[in-house]
């Protein structure tokens, strides 16, 4: 049931017989009795017998099962008591008890005045179902234990969950907030603090394997976390897990380190909740994508099973919709919405829907969220949020870094940008600025100069003293992962993938056939737009993070994929870009003076062309054609002219690009297609004839040019550069692989995971999309890193619980903007003297600090995070991510700190169920 595959989605299965393995024809009676003895199904009697039977059948002998059936659940027995109960000699029964404890059928403690060892038959969850999953070697030998734990933590609760009161009624686990989120609270009580429990069990801690992570991994639904050492046993349980090879002792400082790393990764702190307010035996650090305890509230939409006494609240005036709280929220309680007033809402900020709760409503499976692991990762309310973040392919937190820059917090602004874009200094120079096209401020006067602010912030990366090298945040206690990953191509997609894999704790190896990194950034974009030292500076940061770069290596020629597999590489990210060009298929184009744009730009950027006399004709109307034309002008061509099929309004090149080309001296002729290149007697280019293009696209928007063959124009030329498309040069890279190619020889892959038909090969950037922009490749590289991390970790799914990246822009026609005054947009200074002196140097200056302050003040602050209190479980993780002090925990639900013993669950359930029934019957709230 491994879910590593393209296009796979997963929904929690309904509880039904199809998921229960049948009993054997002649079941072992002792095991059947043990199943009946151990399971309290509340309102479900039969669903678990199959998994229970097979798990207990593998875990216990008949003799052991008979002994277990004589023990009362959760009642401690000393050795003399067990000898008396079973009639066995103490030595014999002690060995059996120790054997069953080692397996996980029993636990033990010394909780009596004499500190005598006593054995306990635990409940299934939390209890023996977990213990059976906590030793990885045992679990791999008995994989049925994984499904037993999964079902035992769900089936018995399915009808009881709506009746669970605040505090959890002694069932399972209980969220305990991040300590620093409530350390200033004057109303908190001791049991709400992790420090209280660490003090209570001071000096008695052990780190152990997370049974949920281990179980899900065996089932093929893992989240790619390393299961080891996330759970902290306290008190006598620490001795139990150490003595039964389930964990190892840790110091208090090590506990703090585990808790800190858990918070960095967005894991929820939970404590056991079956022994009342005077005892716990474990602190877990839970990933909602695999945690069975959090599932009890999330699947059934019954938050009382998890929530703490606290609720997150947003101060909208401080919130900048950066999305950090949304990304980390395990319950999907935080989503991005808007801060601006809405016309549809009567000139007010919109009201947002809240999750229905079972408190006064009939509750059945139609109220559940079977796909909660994905649904909780949807980031935006349907009515939308800040258009800038939505429009950016990488979904950079634009509003957030503008605010940080406005406050002079440049280091934090750079860190925030790099959460989604590892190449901000590059993008600050070459991005196509879709965020600015979408900017709401453009409806008032002019869009905020977002890219110029980003460029200013990212200048810090060009100086070793101020650059930002992100820390490794890895979901393993081992310090990092040792799986070898190969990235083929050091363009923007490959660099992005390397960055985010390194940030996750890998040491990726980047293979680049050229002698320098950057791909088309280095060999395609003119240096007067993007200086090569900018690229080198940002690549150096990726190297410092742990990535290795091997230049001058062409995979497929110098080393094959199979040879890399033999060297231990477990996954490949192929991001070689579109390094070839296309010709028009016309007479004369095979002449020496006819070239394609990518080759021309590569030669210029490699220093192989330092002068270009004569007349240069460029065929094409995109941004690459513009780059060719501007290079030709700066290299001394006496006449440079571009010819394109499209009208001026249809030209792919942006208006700004066209203007800059004209300023450089290029001429642009629209509506012409190449017909024939003319050669002189020596075979050199002397001219080119164009024919009038009457239509570029058909009625359905497909590229289908038509021409007037009688309307011709001949122009003199000394060289022709074709910029009418790019191609992928695969070479022998994919030889022998199962990777399938589609239109334009682009690789076919799953649109979410980027996994190809060859499971260990992922693709991204231009080899998947066709020629596009750097920011698109950067976004793809980030997502590929997520997929590859999941792929190389055993038993992990590529799809379950991923951030969905479904950002929706607010309706700019609906927002109320009349109260905003006009404020002119800042413009970067252009140093024409420097441009004349050094035509290939960067001549557009970076904003000054004063300009940054003025420009960031123009941001309207469109977006805000919205917290649904009905979904919030009060974990406090959101508070650890917010750089703006905009979200806090309030103790609005003190009743949720009511901790009772498991034995009190039925009275607790009954009392609450009665109140609930009255509310439902009489329609009270």
Where are these regions (language model features)?
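Ferredoxin-type iron-sulfur electron-transfer modules and their immediate structural context
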Residues: 33-35, 56-57, 196-199, 203-320, ...
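Short amphipathic alpha-helical interaction segments
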Residues: 86-102
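Beta1-alpha1 glycine-rich phosphate/pyrophosphate-binding loop at the start
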Residues: 396-399, 405-406, 447-451, 487-555, ...
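Glycine-rich dinucleotide-binding loop and its adjacent helix/turn
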Residues: 457-478, 504, 537-557, 581-635, ...
